[in-house]
From Swiss-Prot:
Gene: menD
HAMAP family in UniProt: MenD (MF_01659)
Organism phylogeny: Archaea, Methanobacteriati, Methanobacteriota, Stenosarchaea group, Halobacteria
The name this protein goes by in its record: 2-succinyl-5-enolpyruvyl-6-hydroxy-3-cyclohexene-1-carboxylate synthase
EC number: 2.2.1.9
Key word ATP-binding present: no
Pfam families assigned: TPP_enzyme_C (PF02775), TPP_enzyme_N (PF02776)
Cofactor note as given: Binds 1 thiamine pyrophosphate per subunit.
Length: 586
Protein backbone atom coordinates (compact mmCIF):
# COMPACT_ATOMS: atom_id res chain seq x y z
CA UNK A 1 0.00 0.00 0.00
CA UNK A 2 1.31 3.46 -0.88
CA UNK A 3 2.20 5.96 1.82
CA UNK A 4 0.94 9.32 0.57
CA UNK A 5 1.28 11.01 3.97
CA UNK A 6 2.75 10.46 7.42
CA UNK A 7 -0.61 9.49 8.93
CA UNK A 8 -0.89 6.62 6.46
CA UNK A 9 2.70 5.65 7.24
CA UNK A 10 1.91 5.72 10.96
CA UNK A 11 -1.23 3.61 10.61
CA UNK A 12 0.54 1.07 8.39
CA UNK A 13 3.39 0.81 10.88
CA UNK A 14 0.96 0.19 13.75
CA UNK A 15 -0.87 -2.59 11.90
CA UNK A 16 2.32 -4.17 10.53
CA UNK A 17 4.08 -4.28 13.87
CA UNK A 18 1.07 -5.64 15.72
CA UNK A 19 0.80 -8.39 13.12
CA UNK A 20 4.41 -9.40 13.77
CA UNK A 21 3.66 -10.00 17.47
CA UNK A 22 0.77 -12.30 16.65
CA UNK A 23 -2.24 -10.00 16.52
CA UNK A 24 -4.83 -11.60 14.25
CA UNK A 25 -7.97 -9.53 14.92
CA UNK A 26 -8.71 -5.82 15.37
CA UNK A 27 -12.03 -4.30 16.42
CA UNK A 28 -12.88 -0.96 14.84
CA UNK A 29 -15.52 1.51 15.97
CA UNK A 30 -16.19 3.94 13.11
CA UNK A 31 -15.08 7.55 13.29
CA UNK A 32 -13.09 10.13 11.37
CA UNK A 33 -10.07 10.88 13.55
CA UNK A 34 -9.10 7.19 13.64
CA UNK A 35 -9.13 6.88 9.83
CA UNK A 36 -5.38 6.15 9.44
CA UNK A 37 -5.64 3.24 11.87
CA UNK A 38 -8.93 1.91 10.53
CA UNK A 39 -7.73 1.92 6.92
CA UNK A 40 -4.47 0.20 7.86
CA UNK A 41 -6.17 -2.58 9.79
CA UNK A 42 -8.94 -3.02 7.22
CA UNK A 43 -6.42 -3.46 4.40
CA UNK A 44 -3.90 -5.62 6.25
CA UNK A 45 -3.52 -9.13 4.86
CA UNK A 46 -2.75 -10.80 8.20
CA UNK A 47 -5.29 -9.08 10.46
CA UNK A 48 -9.04 -9.63 10.36
CA UNK A 49 -10.78 -6.35 11.08
CA UNK A 50 -14.26 -6.32 12.62
CA UNK A 51 -16.35 -3.16 12.41
CA UNK A 52 -18.87 -2.65 15.23
CA UNK A 53 -20.92 0.52 15.38
CA UNK A 54 -21.19 1.12 19.12
CA UNK A 55 -18.01 1.62 21.13
CA UNK A 56 -19.29 -0.02 24.30
CA UNK A 57 -20.33 -3.11 22.38
CA UNK A 58 -17.06 -3.13 20.43
CA UNK A 59 -15.02 -3.05 23.63
CA UNK A 60 -16.92 -5.93 25.20
CA UNK A 61 -16.60 -7.87 21.94
CA UNK A 62 -12.82 -7.44 22.09
CA UNK A 63 -12.93 -8.46 25.75
CA UNK A 64 -14.75 -11.69 24.90
CA UNK A 65 -12.34 -12.47 22.09
CA UNK A 66 -9.40 -12.09 24.46
CA UNK A 67 -11.09 -14.17 27.16
CA UNK A 68 -11.48 -17.03 24.71
CA UNK A 69 -8.13 -16.79 22.90
CA UNK A 70 -5.79 -15.24 25.46
CA UNK A 71 -4.72 -12.66 22.86
CA UNK A 72 -5.86 -9.02 22.61
CA UNK A 73 -7.80 -7.67 19.66
CA UNK A 74 -6.69 -4.01 19.39
CA UNK A 75 -9.59 -1.60 19.86
CA UNK A 76 -9.71 1.48 17.65
CA UNK A 77 -11.96 4.51 18.09
CA UNK A 78 -12.16 8.20 17.29
CA UNK A 79 -11.63 11.07 19.71
CA UNK A 80 -14.05 12.51 22.26
CA UNK A 81 -16.66 10.52 24.14
CA UNK A 82 -16.04 7.47 21.94
CA UNK A 83 -13.27 6.18 24.16
CA UNK A 84 -15.31 6.83 27.32
CA UNK A 85 -17.65 4.11 26.08
CA UNK A 86 -14.76 1.64 26.22
CA UNK A 87 -14.48 2.20 29.97
CA UNK A 88 -16.84 -0.51 31.33
CA UNK A 89 -15.02 -3.19 29.34
CA UNK A 90 -11.66 -1.74 30.39
CA UNK A 91 -12.71 -2.13 34.02
CA UNK A 92 -13.68 -5.76 33.44
CA UNK A 93 -10.42 -6.44 31.60
CA UNK A 94 -8.49 -4.93 34.49
CA UNK A 95 -10.27 -6.78 37.27
CA UNK A 96 -10.49 -10.09 35.38
CA UNK A 97 -6.93 -9.86 34.01
CA UNK A 98 -7.86 -9.96 30.34
CA UNK A 99 -5.40 -8.63 27.73
CA UNK A 100 -6.60 -5.53 25.89
CA UNK A 101 -4.88 -2.92 23.71
CA UNK A 102 -6.69 0.39 23.18
CA UNK A 103 -5.72 2.66 20.29
CA UNK A 104 -7.69 5.87 20.79
CA UNK A 105 -7.32 8.55 18.14
CA UNK A 106 -6.91 12.12 19.34
CA UNK A 107 -6.78 15.68 18.02
CA UNK A 108 -3.43 17.45 17.65
CA UNK A 109 -2.05 18.70 20.99
CA UNK A 110 -2.53 22.40 20.26
CA UNK A 111 -6.32 21.86 20.29
CA UNK A 112 -6.32 20.72 23.92
CA UNK A 113 -8.34 22.94 26.25
CA UNK A 114 -9.45 25.09 23.32
CA UNK A 115 -13.13 24.26 22.98
CA UNK A 116 -12.40 22.52 19.68
CA UNK A 117 -15.07 20.10 18.53
CA UNK A 118 -14.90 16.49 19.75
CA UNK A 119 -11.83 17.28 21.82
CA UNK A 120 -11.45 16.13 25.42
CA UNK A 121 -8.52 15.44 27.71
CA UNK A 122 -7.85 11.80 26.85
CA UNK A 123 -4.69 11.45 28.92
CA UNK A 124 -5.00 8.75 31.59
CA UNK A 125 -8.76 8.61 31.00
CA UNK A 126 -8.95 5.08 32.41
CA UNK A 127 -6.84 5.83 35.48
CA UNK A 128 -5.47 2.83 37.35
CA UNK A 129 -7.56 0.41 35.27
CA UNK A 130 -4.80 0.15 32.65
CA UNK A 131 -1.43 -1.53 33.08
CA UNK A 132 0.24 1.32 31.19
CA UNK A 133 -0.66 4.51 29.32
CA UNK A 134 1.19 6.55 26.74
CA UNK A 135 0.38 9.32 24.30
CA UNK A 136 2.27 8.56 21.11
CA UNK A 137 4.24 11.29 19.35
CA UNK A 138 2.64 12.94 16.36
CA UNK A 139 3.22 11.07 13.10
CA UNK A 140 6.38 12.03 11.28
CA UNK A 141 8.60 10.42 8.65
CA UNK A 142 11.50 10.21 11.08
CA UNK A 143 13.47 7.00 11.55
CA UNK A 144 13.90 7.32 15.30
CA UNK A 145 10.20 8.05 15.82
CA UNK A 146 9.18 5.00 13.82
CA UNK A 147 11.60 2.77 15.71
CA UNK A 148 10.14 4.17 18.92
CA UNK A 149 6.61 3.48 17.66
CA UNK A 150 7.43 -0.13 16.82
CA UNK A 151 9.11 -0.63 20.18
CA UNK A 152 6.14 0.86 22.03
CA UNK A 153 3.69 -1.43 20.23
CA UNK A 154 5.70 -4.57 21.02
CA UNK A 155 5.99 -3.55 24.66
CA UNK A 156 2.27 -2.75 24.82
CA UNK A 157 1.28 -6.24 23.72
CA UNK A 158 3.91 -7.74 26.02
CA UNK A 159 2.47 -5.83 28.97
CA UNK A 160 -1.13 -6.64 28.06
CA UNK A 161 -0.34 -10.36 27.91
CA UNK A 162 2.22 -10.45 30.72
CA UNK A 163 2.22 -11.99 34.18
CA UNK A 164 -0.77 -9.85 35.14
CA UNK A 165 -2.67 -9.44 31.86
CA UNK A 166 -4.84 -6.39 31.39
CA UNK A 167 -5.53 -3.24 29.35
CA UNK A 168 -2.88 -0.99 27.82
CA UNK A 169 -3.92 2.42 26.48
CA UNK A 170 -2.10 4.14 23.63
CA UNK A 171 -3.45 7.58 22.71
CA UNK A 172 -2.72 8.36 19.06
CA UNK A 173 -2.96 12.00 17.89
CA UNK A 174 -3.49 12.77 14.20
CA UNK A 175 -3.83 15.99 12.25
CA UNK A 176 -5.37 16.21 8.79
CA UNK A 177 -5.27 14.80 6.18
CA UNK A 178 -6.60 11.66 7.83
CA UNK A 179 -7.33 9.81 4.60
CA UNK A 180 -4.61 8.18 2.46
CA UNK A 181 -4.31 11.29 0.29
CA UNK A 182 -1.31 13.40 -0.60
CA UNK A 183 -0.58 16.00 2.06
CA UNK A 184 -1.44 19.57 1.16
CA UNK A 185 0.91 22.49 1.79
CA UNK A 186 0.71 22.99 5.57
CA UNK A 187 0.07 26.31 7.27
CA UNK A 188 3.08 28.13 8.67
CA UNK A 189 4.41 26.46 11.81
CA UNK A 190 2.64 23.13 11.18
CA UNK A 191 4.83 20.09 10.37
CA UNK A 192 4.87 18.88 6.78
CA UNK A 193 2.66 15.80 6.43
CA UNK A 194 4.37 14.36 3.37
CA UNK A 195 6.60 11.29 3.31
CA UNK A 196 9.89 12.19 1.58
CA UNK A 197 10.79 10.29 -1.58
CA UNK A 198 13.18 7.47 -0.82
CA UNK A 199 12.44 7.48 2.91
CA UNK A 200 11.85 3.72 3.11
CA UNK A 201 14.97 2.98 1.07
CA UNK A 202 17.14 5.19 3.23
CA UNK A 203 15.60 3.98 6.52
CA UNK A 204 14.64 0.32 5.96
CA UNK A 205 14.68 -0.70 9.63
CA UNK A 206 12.35 2.11 10.69
CA UNK A 207 10.07 1.88 7.66
CA UNK A 208 9.84 -1.88 7.25
CA UNK A 209 10.79 -3.24 10.67
CA UNK A 210 12.33 -6.67 11.13
CA UNK A 211 11.32 -10.08 9.83
CA UNK A 212 9.66 -10.71 13.20
CA UNK A 213 8.70 -8.39 16.06
CA UNK A 214 10.81 -5.25 16.32
CA UNK A 215 11.32 -6.10 19.99
CA UNK A 216 10.74 -9.62 21.31
CA UNK A 217 9.12 -9.40 24.74
CA UNK A 218 9.97 -12.57 26.65
CA UNK A 219 7.47 -13.14 29.47
CA UNK A 220 8.63 -15.70 31.99
CA UNK A 221 6.80 -17.90 34.47
CA UNK A 222 7.42 -17.53 38.17
CA UNK A 223 8.81 -20.81 39.42
CA UNK A 224 8.04 -21.63 43.05
CA UNK A 225 11.12 -21.68 45.23
CA UNK A 226 12.26 -24.94 46.79
CA UNK A 227 11.56 -23.43 50.20
CA UNK A 228 7.97 -22.61 49.23
CA UNK A 229 7.36 -26.09 47.84
CA UNK A 230 8.84 -27.70 50.95
CA UNK A 231 6.73 -25.55 53.27
CA UNK A 232 3.53 -26.28 51.40
CA UNK A 233 4.33 -29.98 51.14
CA UNK A 234 5.06 -30.16 54.86
CA UNK A 235 1.73 -28.50 55.66
CA UNK A 236 -0.11 -30.93 53.38
CA UNK A 237 1.59 -34.00 54.84
CA UNK A 238 0.83 -32.89 58.40
CA UNK A 239 -2.84 -32.05 57.77
CA UNK A 240 -5.60 -34.46 58.68
CA UNK A 241 -7.80 -32.89 56.00
CA UNK A 242 -7.42 -30.58 53.06
CA UNK A 243 -9.08 -29.03 50.05
CA UNK A 244 -8.18 -27.58 46.65
CA UNK A 245 -10.35 -24.62 45.62
CA UNK A 246 -10.31 -23.36 42.03
CA UNK A 247 -12.10 -20.04 41.53
CA UNK A 248 -12.73 -18.13 38.29
CA UNK A 249 -9.43 -18.24 36.49
CA UNK A 250 -7.30 -16.09 34.25
CA UNK A 251 -6.21 -17.50 30.91
CA UNK A 252 -4.49 -19.80 30.63
CA UNK A 253 -6.20 -21.82 33.32
CA UNK A 254 -3.99 -24.01 35.50
CA UNK A 255 -3.17 -27.12 33.51
CA UNK A 256 -5.80 -29.74 34.26
CA UNK A 257 -3.27 -32.56 34.37
CA UNK A 258 -1.26 -30.75 37.04
CA UNK A 259 -4.40 -30.32 39.16
CA UNK A 260 -5.26 -33.99 38.74
CA UNK A 261 -1.74 -34.88 39.87
CA UNK A 262 -2.02 -32.52 42.85
CA UNK A 263 -5.37 -33.95 43.91
CA UNK A 264 -4.04 -37.49 43.57
CA UNK A 265 -0.84 -36.80 45.52
CA UNK A 266 -2.50 -34.85 48.33
CA UNK A 267 -5.71 -36.85 48.58
CA UNK A 268 -7.59 -33.54 48.52
CA UNK A 269 -10.90 -33.03 46.72
CA UNK A 270 -11.23 -30.18 44.21
CA UNK A 271 -13.99 -27.58 44.52
CA UNK A 272 -14.15 -26.28 40.95
CA UNK A 273 -16.01 -23.05 40.18
CA UNK A 274 -17.88 -23.27 36.86
CA UNK A 275 -15.61 -20.50 35.52
CA UNK A 276 -12.40 -22.14 36.73
CA UNK A 277 -11.79 -24.08 33.54
CA UNK A 278 -11.70 -27.21 35.67
CA UNK A 279 -15.31 -28.23 36.33
CA UNK A 280 -15.74 -29.49 32.78
CA UNK A 281 -13.38 -31.58 30.70
CA UNK A 282 -11.99 -35.10 30.34
CA UNK A 283 -9.94 -34.72 33.54
CA UNK A 284 -13.06 -34.98 35.73
CA UNK A 285 -12.99 -38.73 35.12
CA UNK A 286 -9.60 -38.89 36.85
CA UNK A 287 -9.95 -36.43 39.74
CA UNK A 288 -12.38 -35.83 42.64
CA UNK A 289 -13.89 -32.68 41.10
CA UNK A 290 -16.85 -31.35 43.10
CA UNK A 291 -19.51 -28.93 41.86
CA UNK A 292 -22.43 -29.27 44.27
CA UNK A 293 -20.73 -27.72 47.29
CA UNK A 294 -22.82 -24.55 47.19
CA UNK A 295 -25.83 -26.55 48.41
CA UNK A 296 -24.35 -29.26 50.61
CA UNK A 297 -21.68 -27.36 52.57
CA UNK A 298 -24.12 -26.75 55.47
CA UNK A 299 -24.33 -30.56 55.79
CA UNK A 300 -20.54 -30.83 56.08
CA UNK A 301 -19.52 -30.64 59.73
CA UNK A 302 -15.81 -31.13 59.13
CA UNK A 303 -13.52 -28.36 57.93
CA UNK A 304 -10.16 -28.61 56.17
CA UNK A 305 -6.88 -27.93 57.93
CA UNK A 306 -5.14 -26.90 54.71
CA UNK A 307 -6.63 -25.19 51.64
CA UNK A 308 -4.77 -24.58 48.38
CA UNK A 309 -6.52 -21.90 46.33
CA UNK A 310 -6.15 -21.06 42.66
CA UNK A 311 -7.87 -18.28 40.71
CA UNK A 312 -10.11 -15.48 41.93
CA UNK A 313 -12.62 -15.58 44.76
CA UNK A 314 -15.24 -18.31 44.19
CA UNK A 315 -18.68 -17.44 42.84
CA UNK A 316 -20.37 -19.37 45.66
CA UNK A 317 -21.13 -17.29 48.74
CA UNK A 318 -21.61 -20.39 50.95
CA UNK A 319 -18.14 -21.55 49.90
CA UNK A 320 -16.60 -18.17 50.67
CA UNK A 321 -18.24 -18.24 54.09
CA UNK A 322 -17.12 -21.83 54.68
CA UNK A 323 -13.51 -20.88 53.92
CA UNK A 324 -13.81 -17.78 56.08
CA UNK A 325 -14.95 -19.80 59.08
CA UNK A 326 -12.53 -22.69 58.62
CA UNK A 327 -9.58 -22.60 60.99
CA UNK A 328 -7.28 -23.58 58.16
CA UNK A 329 -3.96 -22.64 56.70
CA UNK A 330 -4.95 -21.22 53.33
CA UNK A 331 -2.43 -20.84 50.52
CA UNK A 332 -3.46 -18.31 47.85
CA UNK A 333 -1.54 -19.10 44.65
CA UNK A 334 -1.27 -16.08 42.35
CA UNK A 335 1.34 -15.72 39.59
CA UNK A 336 1.07 -11.92 39.70
CA UNK A 337 1.22 -11.65 43.48
CA UNK A 338 -2.26 -10.12 43.59
CA UNK A 339 -4.73 -10.46 46.45
CA UNK A 340 -8.23 -11.65 45.56
CA UNK A 341 -9.58 -12.91 48.87
CA UNK A 342 -11.98 -10.41 50.44
CA UNK A 343 -12.62 -12.21 53.76
CA UNK A 344 -8.95 -11.74 54.70
CA UNK A 345 -8.60 -15.12 56.37
CA UNK A 346 -5.97 -16.61 54.05
CA UNK A 347 -2.61 -17.18 55.70
CA UNK A 348 -0.11 -17.47 52.82
CA UNK A 349 0.34 -15.78 49.43
CA UNK A 350 2.35 -17.91 47.02
CA UNK A 351 3.65 -15.91 44.08
CA UNK A 352 4.21 -18.61 41.49
CA UNK A 353 2.93 -20.04 38.24
CA UNK A 354 -0.07 -22.16 39.19
CA UNK A 355 0.70 -25.11 36.95
CA UNK A 356 4.34 -25.26 38.02
CA UNK A 357 3.45 -25.01 41.69
CA UNK A 358 0.81 -27.74 41.44
CA UNK A 359 3.28 -30.01 39.66
CA UNK A 360 6.06 -29.34 42.15
CA UNK A 361 3.89 -29.99 45.20
CA UNK A 362 2.43 -33.12 43.60
CA UNK A 363 5.97 -34.43 43.12
CA UNK A 364 6.83 -33.66 46.75
CA UNK A 365 3.96 -35.33 48.62
CA UNK A 366 2.31 -38.73 48.77
CA UNK A 367 -0.73 -38.66 51.00
CA UNK A 368 -3.80 -40.89 51.03
CA UNK A 369 -7.31 -39.43 51.29
CA UNK A 370 -8.69 -39.11 54.82
CA UNK A 371 -12.16 -39.08 56.32
CA UNK A 372 -12.81 -35.53 55.08
CA UNK A 373 -12.26 -36.56 51.46
CA UNK A 374 -14.32 -39.69 52.05
CA UNK A 375 -17.21 -37.57 53.31
CA UNK A 376 -17.04 -35.34 50.24
CA UNK A 377 -17.00 -38.45 48.06
CA UNK A 378 -20.38 -39.31 49.61
CA UNK A 379 -21.89 -35.82 49.50
CA UNK A 380 -21.03 -34.96 45.89
CA UNK A 381 -22.80 -37.84 44.09
CA UNK A 382 -25.53 -37.82 46.72
CA UNK A 383 -26.30 -34.20 45.93
CA UNK A 384 -26.57 -34.77 42.19
CA UNK A 385 -28.86 -37.76 42.72
CA UNK A 386 -31.13 -35.65 44.91
CA UNK A 387 -31.43 -32.67 42.59
CA UNK A 388 -31.73 -34.50 39.27
CA UNK A 389 -35.07 -33.50 37.84
CA UNK A 390 -35.85 -31.38 40.92
CA UNK A 391 -34.00 -28.20 39.99
CA UNK A 392 -35.92 -24.90 40.15
CA UNK A 393 -37.01 -23.83 36.69
CA UNK A 394 -34.19 -21.33 36.18
CA UNK A 395 -31.62 -23.71 37.61
CA UNK A 396 -32.85 -26.43 35.27
CA UNK A 397 -32.13 -24.20 32.28
CA UNK A 398 -28.50 -23.81 33.37
CA UNK A 399 -28.16 -27.52 34.12
CA UNK A 400 -29.46 -28.35 30.65
CA UNK A 401 -27.43 -25.62 28.95
CA UNK A 402 -24.19 -27.40 29.87
CA UNK A 403 -25.49 -30.98 29.87
CA UNK A 404 -26.87 -30.66 26.34
CA UNK A 405 -24.14 -28.42 24.93
CA UNK A 406 -22.10 -29.84 22.04
CA UNK A 407 -18.71 -31.32 22.85
CA UNK A 408 -16.64 -29.20 22.45
CA UNK A 409 -18.33 -25.81 22.83
CA UNK A 410 -17.98 -22.40 24.42
CA UNK A 411 -20.58 -21.42 27.00
CA UNK A 412 -20.79 -17.80 28.17
CA UNK A 413 -22.92 -17.16 31.24
CA UNK A 414 -24.21 -13.82 32.53
CA UNK A 415 -23.80 -12.41 35.99
CA UNK A 416 -26.61 -12.13 38.54
CA UNK A 417 -28.61 -15.39 38.84
CA UNK A 418 -27.41 -17.33 35.75
CA UNK A 419 -23.83 -17.79 36.96
CA UNK A 420 -25.05 -18.66 40.45
CA UNK A 421 -27.50 -21.22 39.08
CA UNK A 422 -24.75 -22.70 36.93
CA UNK A 423 -22.56 -22.94 40.02
CA UNK A 424 -25.34 -24.74 41.89
CA UNK A 425 -26.77 -26.96 39.16
CA UNK A 426 -24.05 -27.38 36.53
CA UNK A 427 -22.74 -30.87 37.25
CA UNK A 428 -19.10 -31.69 36.47
CA UNK A 429 -18.81 -33.58 33.20
CA UNK A 430 -16.15 -34.86 30.83
CA UNK A 431 -17.30 -32.77 27.86
CA UNK A 432 -14.77 -30.15 26.72
CA UNK A 433 -16.67 -26.99 27.61
CA UNK A 434 -14.96 -23.61 27.79
CA UNK A 435 -17.21 -21.80 30.27
CA UNK A 436 -16.68 -18.05 30.53
CA UNK A 437 -18.21 -15.08 32.31
CA UNK A 438 -17.46 -11.51 33.35
CA UNK A 439 -16.67 -12.03 37.05
CA UNK A 440 -14.00 -9.34 37.32
CA UNK A 441 -16.38 -6.52 38.19
CA UNK A 442 -19.49 -8.71 37.83
CA UNK A 443 -21.54 -6.25 35.80
CA UNK A 444 -24.53 -7.18 33.68
CA UNK A 445 -23.59 -4.83 30.83
CA UNK A 446 -21.99 -6.04 27.62
CA UNK A 447 -23.00 -9.67 28.06
CA UNK A 448 -24.15 -10.36 24.49
CA UNK A 449 -21.16 -8.52 23.06
CA UNK A 450 -18.65 -10.36 25.26
CA UNK A 451 -20.22 -13.71 24.41
CA UNK A 452 -20.19 -13.01 20.68
CA UNK A 453 -16.57 -11.86 20.90
CA UNK A 454 -15.70 -15.16 22.57
CA UNK A 455 -17.53 -16.98 19.80
CA UNK A 456 -15.57 -15.05 17.19
CA UNK A 457 -12.37 -16.40 18.72
CA UNK A 458 -13.22 -20.07 18.22
CA UNK A 459 -14.75 -22.48 15.74
CA UNK A 460 -16.59 -24.27 18.56
CA UNK A 461 -20.37 -23.79 18.88
CA UNK A 462 -21.30 -20.86 21.12
CA UNK A 463 -23.97 -20.79 23.81
CA UNK A 464 -24.77 -17.59 25.71
CA UNK A 465 -27.05 -17.65 28.76
CA UNK A 466 -28.31 -14.30 29.99
CA UNK A 467 -30.99 -12.85 32.20
CA UNK A 468 -33.59 -10.44 30.88
CA UNK A 469 -32.01 -7.30 32.36
CA UNK A 470 -28.58 -8.20 31.01
CA UNK A 471 -30.18 -8.91 27.63
CA UNK A 472 -31.89 -5.51 27.74
CA UNK A 473 -28.60 -3.78 28.61
CA UNK A 474 -26.87 -5.09 25.50
CA UNK A 475 -29.46 -5.63 22.78
CA UNK A 476 -27.33 -3.53 20.43
CA UNK A 477 -24.58 -6.12 20.85
CA UNK A 478 -26.65 -8.50 18.72
CA UNK A 479 -25.53 -6.59 15.64
CA UNK A 480 -22.23 -8.49 15.89
CA UNK A 481 -24.05 -11.63 14.76
CA UNK A 482 -24.22 -10.27 11.22
CA UNK A 483 -21.29 -7.84 11.18
CA UNK A 484 -18.80 -10.34 12.62
CA UNK A 485 -20.44 -13.48 11.27
CA UNK A 486 -20.86 -15.17 14.65
CA UNK A 487 -23.43 -17.91 15.20
CA UNK A 488 -24.80 -18.45 18.70
CA UNK A 489 -27.58 -19.99 20.70
CA UNK A 490 -28.67 -17.21 23.05
CA UNK A 491 -30.77 -18.26 26.03
CA UNK A 492 -32.62 -15.38 27.71
CA UNK A 493 -34.09 -16.33 31.08
CA UNK A 494 -36.85 -13.76 31.48
CA UNK A 495 -38.25 -13.39 34.99
CA UNK A 496 -39.36 -9.82 34.26
CA UNK A 497 -36.88 -7.92 36.39
CA UNK A 498 -34.14 -8.28 38.95
CA UNK A 499 -34.88 -11.68 40.40
CA UNK A 500 -31.64 -11.73 42.38
CA UNK A 501 -33.04 -9.11 44.76
CA UNK A 502 -35.36 -11.76 46.19
CA UNK A 503 -32.39 -13.09 48.15
CA UNK A 504 -31.92 -9.76 49.96
CA UNK A 505 -33.83 -8.43 52.98
CA UNK A 506 -35.22 -5.60 50.83
CA UNK A 507 -37.65 -8.17 49.40
CA UNK A 508 -39.91 -7.58 52.41
CA UNK A 509 -40.04 -3.81 51.86
CA UNK A 510 -43.14 -2.32 50.28
CA UNK A 511 -41.07 -0.55 47.60
CA UNK A 512 -39.36 -3.80 46.51
CA UNK A 513 -41.10 -4.25 43.16
CA UNK A 514 -40.88 -0.70 41.87
CA UNK A 515 -37.34 0.15 42.89
CA UNK A 516 -35.49 -3.18 43.06
CA UNK A 517 -37.15 -6.02 41.15
CA UNK A 518 -38.13 -3.41 38.53
CA UNK A 519 -40.51 -5.42 36.33
CA UNK A 520 -40.29 -4.08 32.77
CA UNK A 521 -42.92 -6.06 30.83
CA UNK A 522 -40.80 -6.00 27.67
CA UNK A 523 -41.44 -8.27 24.71
CA UNK A 524 -38.01 -9.24 23.41
CA UNK A 525 -39.15 -10.89 20.19
CA UNK A 526 -38.94 -7.64 18.15
CA UNK A 527 -35.32 -7.20 19.28
CA UNK A 528 -34.39 -10.44 17.54
CA UNK A 529 -36.37 -9.46 14.45
CA UNK A 530 -34.50 -6.14 14.33
CA UNK A 531 -31.26 -8.04 13.79
CA UNK A 532 -32.82 -10.76 11.60
CA UNK A 533 -32.31 -13.42 14.27
CA UNK A 534 -34.67 -16.33 14.83
CA UNK A 535 -36.67 -16.20 18.07
CA UNK A 536 -38.49 -18.84 20.08
CA UNK A 537 -40.26 -18.73 23.44
CA UNK A 538 -41.12 -21.37 26.03
CA UNK A 539 -42.05 -21.63 29.69
CA UNK A 540 -41.32 -25.32 30.27
CA UNK A 541 -38.24 -27.47 30.69
CA UNK A 542 -39.40 -29.89 28.04
CA UNK A 543 -39.96 -27.04 25.61
CA UNK A 544 -36.55 -25.60 26.36
CA UNK A 545 -34.76 -28.90 25.87
CA UNK A 546 -36.39 -29.36 22.50
CA UNK A 547 -35.67 -25.83 21.27
CA UNK A 548 -32.15 -25.81 22.67
CA UNK A 549 -31.13 -29.18 21.25
CA UNK A 550 -32.31 -28.11 17.82
CA UNK A 551 -30.68 -24.67 18.01
CA UNK A 552 -27.18 -25.73 19.16
CA UNK A 553 -26.87 -28.10 16.24
CA UNK A 554 -28.26 -25.78 13.59
CA UNK A 555 -25.18 -23.66 12.84
CA UNK A 556 -27.41 -20.58 12.97
CA UNK A 557 -28.25 -17.96 15.57
CA UNK A 558 -31.39 -18.14 17.64
CA UNK A 559 -32.67 -16.39 20.75
CA UNK A 560 -34.58 -18.73 23.06
CA UNK A 561 -36.58 -16.88 25.69
CA UNK A 562 -37.55 -18.89 28.77
CA UNK A 563 -40.28 -17.20 30.77
CA UNK A 564 -40.07 -17.78 34.52
CA UNK A 565 -41.39 -16.29 37.76
CA UNK A 566 -38.60 -15.05 40.00
CA UNK A 567 -40.46 -15.30 43.30
CA UNK A 568 -41.35 -18.95 42.75
CA UNK A 569 -37.80 -19.77 41.69
CA UNK A 570 -36.38 -18.15 44.82
CA UNK A 571 -38.75 -20.15 47.01
CA UNK A 572 -37.90 -23.36 45.13
CA UNK A 573 -34.16 -22.75 45.53
CA UNK A 574 -34.58 -22.23 49.27
CA UNK A 575 -36.74 -25.33 49.69
CA UNK A 576 -34.34 -27.48 47.69
CA UNK A 577 -31.34 -26.29 49.69
CA UNK A 578 -33.10 -27.14 52.94
CA UNK A 579 -34.08 -30.57 51.62
CA UNK A 580 -30.50 -31.26 50.52
CA UNK A 581 -29.07 -30.33 53.91
CA UNK A 582 -31.67 -32.40 55.73
CA UNK A 583 -31.15 -35.47 53.56
CA UNK A 584 -27.36 -35.37 53.26
CA UNK A 585 -26.78 -34.24 56.83
CA UNK A 586 -28.17 -37.46 58.28
Amino acid sequence: MATPNVNTLWGQTVADELATVGIETAVLAPGSRSTPLAVAFAQHDDIEAVSLLDERSAAFFALGYAKRTGQPAPLVCTSGTALANFHPAVIEADTARVPMVLLTADRPPELADSGANQTIDQADLYGDAVRSYRTLPEPEAAARKLRSLRTTLCRAVGTATGTEPGPVHLNVPFRKPLEPLAAAEPPAGVPDGAVPDGFATENPLAARGRDGPFVEVHSGCTDPSATTVDELATAVEAAASGLIVCGPTDRPAPDAESLVALADATGFSVFADPLSGLRFGPHVDDAPVCGGYDAYLPALEQTPEVVIRFGASPTSKPLRQYLRDADARQFIVDPAGGWREATFTATDLVVADETRLATAVADAVDRTPGSYADRLAELEPGYWRLVEGEEPQEGAMLADAVALAPDPSTVFVSNSMPVRDLDRFGAPQAASLSVLGNRGASGIDGIASTALGAGFGTDDPLVAVTGDLAYYHDMNGLLAVSRAGVDATIVCINNDGGGIFHVLPIEAHESFDKWFRTPHGLDFEPSAALYDIEFARTDSREGFRSLYSEAVGSGETQVIEVQTESGHNHADRTALREAVVEELGR
